[in-house]
């Protein structure tokens, strides 16, 4: 075999060996692939709480003289955003919608607004809400039946206050007072003040 051929084969073997060594070194120094990490998204619900209960309709007014009672229901939605600390979060309200149906055919109404809930202890809380309501009550400025409240117009302003206790992780019980009036925007402004109790289920 010619010397040039032997030299060529030697160079080829040396190159192959060198490339193999480089590949081995690269394999040893290459960082191991990262383990796949499970991304857990925070659980949230569009609906925050459901409430239902009973109330006495305007017990000190015309519609309450016959012990008029209502069936009530309310949906509270999740807060639009969360605050970084607990105190600030109390100022972020939950939107709500609800309704009240009278068993004796007196004033029914539907409402919407904002609710602020403040924890006094882990089990005890207070809350307030503001909003508006539409109703089918008396709006006749000339004559109001003696058993009806003169509400003047629709919609009305609605305010409510509650005190409540958490019975379990998801269940709560609260006493609520609500008031509806037109704030003097109509000639008649008797208004309605209802008191009652509600049960809430949180998601």
Regions inferred by a protein language model and the residue ranges of each:
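Cleavable N-terminal export/targeting peptides
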Residues: 1-43
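Transmembrane beta-strands of outer-membrane beta-barrel proteins
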Residues: 48-52, 93-97, 124-130, 173-175, ...
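Sequence/structural signature of outer-membrane beta-barrel proteins
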Residues: 57-61, 80-82, 98-104, 135-139, ...
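Solvent-exposed loop/turn segments connecting transmembrane beta-strands
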Residues: 59-67, 99-110, 120-122, 184-190
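Outer-membrane beta-barrel "beta-signal"
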Residues: 69-75, 191-203
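Residue-level signature of outer-membrane beta-barrel architecture
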Residues: 75-79, 101, 116-118, 165, ...
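Repeated loop/turn-to-beta-strand initiation elements of outer-membrane beta-barrel proteins
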Residues: 80-85, 122-126, 167-175
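Outer-membrane beta-barrel translocator/channel fold
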Residues: 128-160, 164
């Amino acid at each position: 075999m010619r010397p040039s051929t032997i030299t060529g084969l030697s160079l080829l073997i040396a190159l192959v060996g060198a490339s193999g060594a480089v590949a081995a070194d690269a394999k040893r120094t290459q960082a191991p692939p990262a383990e796949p990490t499970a991304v857990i998204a925070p659980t949230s619900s569009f609906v925050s709480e459901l409430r239902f209960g009973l109330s006495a309709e305007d017990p000190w007014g015309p519609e309450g003289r016959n012990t008029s009672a209502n069936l009530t229901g309310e949906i509270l939605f999740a807060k639009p955003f969360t605050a970084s600390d607990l105190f600030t979060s109390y100022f972020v309200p939950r939107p709500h919608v609800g309704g009240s149906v009278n068993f004796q055919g007196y004033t029914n109404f539907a409402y919407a607004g904002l609710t602020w809930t403040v924890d006094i202890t882990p089990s005890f809380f207070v809350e307030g809400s503001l909003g508006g309501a539409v109703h089918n009550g008396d709006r006749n400025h000339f004559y109001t039946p003696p058993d009806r409240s003169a509400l003047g117009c629709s919609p009305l302003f609605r305010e409510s206050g509650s005190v409540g206790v958490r019975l379990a992780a998801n269940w709560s019980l609260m006493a609520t007072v609500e008031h509806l009036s037109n704030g003097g925007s109509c000639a008649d402004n008797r208004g309605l003040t209802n008191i009652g109790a509600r049960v809430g289920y949180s998601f």
